[in-house]
Amino acid sequence: MTEEVSRKQNFRQLGLSKWLVESLDAMRIRTPTAIQSGCIPEILKGRDCIGGAKTGSGKTIAFAGPMLTQWSEDPTGMFGIVLTPTRELAMQIAEQFTALGSYMNIRVALVVGGESIVDQALQLQRKPHFIIATPGRLAHHILNSGDDTVGGLKRVKYLVLDEADILLTETFSNDLKTCVGALPPKEKRQTLLFTATITDQVRALQDAPVQKGKQPLFCYEVENVDNVAIPSTLNTEYVLVPEHVKEAYLYQLLTCESYANSTAIIFVNRTTAAEVLRRTLKALDVRVASLHSQMPQQERTNSMHRFRANAARVLIATDVASRGLDIPTVELVINYDIPSDPDTFIHRSGRTARAGRKGDAISFITQRDVSRIEAIEARINMKMTECDKVHDTAVIRKALTKVSKAKREALMAMEKENFGERRKLQKRKTQKDGKRV
C-alpha cells in the first residue's frame, strides 16, 4: 500500500551518520525526498524493503544512505552488492557511492560487461566494500574466477536490486540465480528492491513467508506509482508523421526555434535505426552521440561523457538509456519509435522533467502506431496534444531534400562497412560472454 511520511525531517533525524549527512550537504542534498524519508528509517531497523517511486525521486540515496551508515560502523570486507540491468546505470550508481563515501575512503568495484575481466577480478580480490554490477558479468566471475575473487560475497550484509521489475524478468533469471546463490541466505542479509514500476511480480514478494528471526518485509510506494505515472511538469505531445520521411520531420523539430539549442534524447526501438540516425544527423551538422547495446563499452562511455558535457546536444538511444539515468539538463525526449509497452514510454519520458524541472516528450506517430498510443494514453491517464512546431510545408521546403541525401549516404556507408554483420558478431560475442547489455 501507499504510505505517507512527513518530509520535514532532515537526514540526521532519519538516522544517517553525521559524516554522511555532511557529505550530502557538500553535494547540496539537504532535504529528503518522500522515498528517502519513507525507506531509510525502516532499512536502518534491519527490514527488507520494496521501494517504489517515480523516476528522478532519489531512490539511490534511499538505499545507499542506510548501507553506508551501517558500513561505517565496521568498515571492513565486502558489505553490499547492488545489481542493476544496464552498464550505464551501474556506472552512475558506482559514481554516487564513491561520491557519498569520499569522506571515508570507501572502496567501490564496478563489475559490468565490456570491461577487462582480469582487472575486475583483481578489484574483487582486494575485497571492495561495495560491488555495483550487472548480473551477467558478476555471474561470470562467480562461475569462473575462483574463491579468492568472489569468496567475500558469502559475507555481504546487503543485496540491492535496482530496477527490480526488470531484473526479475526471464531475461536475467539464470544470472540472478547465480549471483544470489553466492550470497548468504536471505535470513542472514537484508534485501532491498527499488523500482519506478512495482509490477505484480514484485508486489507478490510481500506475500512470501517471513524468515525466522527477521522482521516483516516493508513496502513503500510514493504517490501510488501505478496511477501517477508521469511528472506534472512533463508536457506530452505528438506529431503525425509519414513513415518514409520521419528523418526529415526529426531534423526539422531539432532545428526549429523552440528546440535549436535544447538537449534531447531520441529513443528508437532498434540499434540499426540508432546508427542510421546518428550518421544522418551528424552529416547535417547536429552535435550527436548514440547509445545502444551493440556498441563497444568504451564508445558507450564516451557517448555518455560527451552528452553530459554538452559536447553532444542530442543522444540517440535504444531503451538501454530509458532506465534510471540521471542527466538533469535534458529538456526534450523524442519517441522516434513508439514502444510496445506503455511503461517503457513512461521510463523514456522520465529522462526529462526531473526533480521539478519542466520538460517535453514528443512522440512521432505513424499510421501503425495508433493502438500503441491509445494504450499509452490509457496508462498515463491523459491525452497527448498535437505539436504545432513542425508543419508539412516547412518540412518539404526546408528539410526533405538534404535529409534524404544524408540518409542515403549513411545507409551506403553502413553497407560498405558491413554494419549488420559486425552487429551480428558483437551479439554472438555478447551472448557467449554472458553479458546482457
From Swiss-Prot:
Q: Which UniProt keywords apply?
A: ATP-binding, Helicase, Hydrolase, Nucleotide-binding, Nucleus, Ribosome biogenesis, RNA-binding, rRNA processing
GO molecular function terms noted in the UniProt entry = ATP binding; ATP hydrolysis activity; RNA binding; RNA helicase activity
Motif DEAD box: which ranges?
Answer: 162-165
- Where does the Helicase ATP-binding domain start and stop, copy by copy? 40-216
Query: Region annotation Disordered: residue ranges?
Result: 417-437
Free-text note on domains in this protein's UniProt record: The Q motif is unique to and characteristic of the DEAD box family of RNA helicases and controls ATP binding and hydrolysis.
By what name is this protein known?
A: ATP-dependent RNA helicase DBP8
Q: Origin organism of this chain?
A: Candida glabrata (strain ATCC 2001 / BCRC 20586 / JCM 3761 / NBRC 0622 / NRRL Y-65 / CBS 138)
Per the record, the gene is DBP8
